[in-house]
Amino acid sequence: MNYEGFRALSYNAADQKNAELMAPVYRNVPKDIPVIGTHVWPAQAAIHAGMKYVVNAIPDNWPMALHLSEGSVHTIQCHNSYMGYRILNGMNKEKVNRPMPADSLVYTGHYIDHELVQGIEADCAARIRRKENGKPMRFLLTIGGAGAQKEIFAAIIKYLLPYIEKKQAALYVNVGDYKNVWDALIAEIPEMKKYATEHFDNWTDTEEFAKKALDEKEEIEGIHGFWHKNIFEAVYCTNLLMRSCDV
């Protein structure tokens, strides 16, 4: 399954039916209490349970039928995503679909993580100083929930390797809980191994690195790979690394 599969209305139809199994979670919740689903399944389940005010907060900017919860208000982050959902672009192959009702879509703007916002002034000042002082520019690559970006990662890493070697760039690679992606990258680009430090399934080590990277006295070089078996750690790792990266 890839993003084209998740894009199909037929995939969503099966998901909406399966979500009936989760409706009992809302059985004892008053039906006029607002519900915000940060994934489509709880939003779909809330609709099945008869909740009256359901917001489906869509995290992806690639319009996919996977994220549709019929009967809820869908919040969208960017204009092109809004238009893609409005016309259900490509969700029924080449057929032109009836548009979603205008009142079921709301353009909200970008969702920004607390960690990025709370230190934004100090962190941006540190970014400027790194640039002025000729420090390596720090790039952060993060895998998505489906683990489907390996080819894109490989192309970026191949391009950056000469700059990493010259200490003009440094790279964080968070493969989430997909260790197979890291292994595939190493297999495809064996030369990256000599620059790589692996921070694997050790949350304390990850926290310590993220803290160290914020210290301007510390030199961050090479490639730092992050993988965690625990899904929360796999995702939240990115929140910690964002503050010290440049791109």
Give the ranges of each region predicted by the language model.
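Structural motif
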Residues: 33-34, 53, 138, 240, ...
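Short boundary motifs at domain starts and secondary-structure transition points
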Residues: 25-27, 65-66, 127-133, 215-216
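Active-site and donor-binding regions of nucleotide-sugar-utilizing enzymes
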Residues: 1-101
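A nucleotide-sugar donor-handling region in carbohydrate enzymes
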Residues: 71-158, 174-183
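Donor-nucleotide binding loops and adjacent catalytic segments primarily
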Residues: 130-243
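Short glycine-/small-residue-rich Rossmann-like dinucleotide-binding loops
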Residues: 40, 144, 246
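Structural alpha-beta junctions
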Residues: 50-54, 79, 94-104, 161-170, ...
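Conserved beta-strand scaffold positions in the cores of enzyme catalytic domains, especially
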Residues: 54, 104-107, 224-227
